[in-house]
């Protein structure tokens, strides 16, 4: 270790920053969060620093450097672009025995600003000793995703109880075990879920129960130190009580398949689960992020093939929670958009099972974004409607007259297998046969494919290209923007402007579309591209529709 990590108490202590530019601003921002009284010394000080340090506790001095301003400083920061001046500041601070940091000059620094993960009062500093600050920032970014914001509130709560815990639990071992149970159990779960009052009440109840179960006996060692100990049976009983409490169910949206689209909260709950019940639309990459030793149970539904009926899934969730387990119900997309999450929490509520719901990116959002098809656009669409192709008990959704607004985008979930019925019904109801429509298959995944056409042509195009499920349909004028706005997997494009025009559609960069005079595939290229398409599992659903806009 070339440097020793220390945490300075700078609240209401003077810190001198020499320099008034962007570098000084970054340091002032960090130091102000620690409560320091900051003096900025520079002939010119930018407006951002002026706004940041507008409080009367800070001081802005519009003067050239003079070492007399170092008086009473706790630390000094040299943040100028004048190398000679920075050396002088270092020499003056060293002579006064005041720690100094010369920005971006490690050999002139008595201390280094680490990359900081702030969960006040929990603070983590990461330093490369000035060797690779970018790497330190990357490590910090990784830690930011792993450490919930609730840890700060949890630490503050522990601080409030520290005295009571010490008074009621006489041994160090007993206190350590108490805090381990609190930080790994119900108290932390409540805090992370944002239920601060319930977390406080739970911690108080845990402390009272622990104190009541402790049998303490005083003893004194040869040095006269107290060695009162908690009996082993009492500690064992506490652990048993903690393990036998009611579990909790987390209804988690797994998103469209790309694991990078998971929320931080989803990832945290997945990694603390005892058992995971997952759907067919949960990608292997997402499932792999669950806790390694958690039980993983497939309860997915495919078209005309339900591994476990919904009532059976509800029962599994209830029973697992009653066993005291932390249960993750992992659902593709978002639990509340054609995901039957509402039915599951109704069942949990009926059995008084605690639960949380974590939203996910629904397939419509992912498919539109990754296909370059904005669901709304000021020039094309002022609202968006999410519709299922099938209603409850598998009945087809034939409410075509609801989908005739040309200023609205309509997204059909679970509509690929009924594509001929949908397109014919829409045209018969009065929708123009030239209305643009797209099929997006495996949205957000490396094998994503997009097929564009019109209501009149899309069935024939799909018969030729056979895009696999899972897939959804996007209908509306916004689909016409796909050709210009598509961005995903462009490195896989096979684009040939020299081939002769044909009547066939063509596949480009995972995108099959109607032919353009300036971009055609020849027959060999088309056959090669289409051979890359594989049939995946289909999907099913039985809710009606959601209108947004």
From Swiss-Prot:
Organism: Psychrobacter arcticus (strain DSM 17307 / VKM B-2377 / 273-4)
Biological processes, Gene Ontology terms: cobalamin biosynthetic process; methylation; siroheme biosynthetic process
A family per Pfam: TP_methylase
Function as written in the Swiss-Prot or TrEMBL entry: Then it catalyzes the NAD-dependent ring dehydrogenation of precorrin-2 to yield sirohydrochlorin. Finally, it catalyzes the ferrochelation of sirohydrochlorin to yield siroheme.
UniProt-annotated binding residues for NAD(+): 22-23, 43-44
UniProt keyword terms in alphabetical order: Cobalamin biosynthesis, Lyase, Methyltransferase, Multifunctional enzyme, NAD, Oxidoreductase, Phosphoprotein, Porphyrin biosynthesis, S-adenosyl-L-methionine, Transferase
Domain of life (superkingdom): Bacteria
Region annotated Precorrin-2 dehydrogenase /sirohydrochlorin ferrochelatase, chain positions: 1-203
Residues annotated as the enzyme's active site: 279, 301
Taxonomic classification: Bacteria, Pseudomonadati, Pseudomonadota, Gammaproteobacteria, Moraxellales
Pathway(s) this gene product operates in, as recorded in its UniProt entry: Cofactor biosynthesis; adenosylcobalamin biosynthesis; precorrin-2 from uroporphyrinogen III: step 1/1; Cofactor biosynthesis; adenosylcobalamin biosynthesis; sirohydrochlorin from precorrin-2: step 1/1; Porphyrin-containing compound metabolism; siroheme biosynthesis; precorrin-2 from uroporphyrinogen III: step 1/1; Porphyrin-containing compound metabolism; siroheme biosynthesis; siroheme from sirohydrochlorin: step 1/1
Family per similarity comment: In the N-terminal section; belongs to the precorrin-2 dehydrogenase / sirohydrochlorin ferrochelatase family. In the C-terminal section; belongs to the precorrin methyltransferase family.
NCBIfam families cross-referenced by the UniProt entry: cobA_cysG_Cterm, cysG_Nterm, PRK06136.1, PRK10637.1
Protein name: Siroheme synthase
PROSITE patterns cross-referenced by the UniProt entry: SUMT_2
Phosphoserine carried by residues: 128
Keyword Oxidoreductase among record annotations: yes
Reaction catalyzed: uroporphyrinogen III + 2 S-adenosyl-L-methionine = precorrin-2 + 2 S-adenosyl-L-homocysteine + H(+); precorrin-2 + NAD(+) = sirohydrochlorin + NADH + 2 H(+); siroheme + 2 H(+) = sirohydrochlorin + Fe(2+)
Enzyme Commission number(s) of this protein: 2.1.1.107, 1.3.1.76, 4.99.1.4
GO molecular function: NAD binding; precorrin-2 dehydrogenase activity; sirohydrochlorin ferrochelatase activity; uroporphyrin-III C-methyltransferase activity
